Amino acid sequence: PLDKRENRLLKRSFDIIFSLLFFILLGSFIFPLLAIIIKLSSKGPIFFKQERWGLNNKRITCYKFRSMYKESSDIDEEGNFQQAFKDDPRITLIGKILRKTNMDELPQFWNVLIGNMSVVGPRPHPTQLNIQSMELVDNYMLRHMVIPGITGLAQVNGCRGETRTTEDMQKRVNFDLYYIQRWNFWLDLQIIIQTVINIFRGDQNAY
């Protein structure tokens, strides 16, 4: 469906309108408030930048509110990418709240405005995680056929947080591929609504 120009235009138009409304109605006061809280709670920058893979494997810079201590590393002692996990000591007290409520992802609306992310789509993974997964997970690279999103079908179906096993990642990718194959505008709206519901309900995999 997203190989059709009119569908891409519809999705892009929605992304721009939705993001602008977010910044005007919510971002104008949420961003300054969170910036102050983050700066007062721990040393380090307000925003966290990370290289991730976007459409057609293009490297993009993904923005988030910093939720970990400045000195934290995402590479373990064996040189492998270390995902955030439950009770992760790298995460600050404020960071736990931000991640639990998805508020750490809010700066990605800027990514949406500039066009390298969408409101809805497969979540973009860090470079190291892509490299680890592409050899182990069937059809993994096909998830990069569309622009990645802030939220996605996999996330509203419980595939959030750490992917401890290859099977966990395969399940996430299967949801991503289903989304790509079955995309329609109403599916995006359903995912957005379910994301909001999950935020208020709480997600045990959000950490």
Regions flagged by a language model, labelled:
Residues 20, 45, 55, 96, ...:
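Gly/Ser/Thr-rich helix-start
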Residues 34, 48-49, 120-122, 127-128, ...:
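Short, hydrophobic secondary-structure boundary micro-motifs
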Residues 47-90, 151-172:
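Short, glycine-rich, amphipathic interfacial segments at transmembrane boundaries or analogous
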Residues 73-76, 121, 204:
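Short amphipathic alpha-helical interaction/hinge segments
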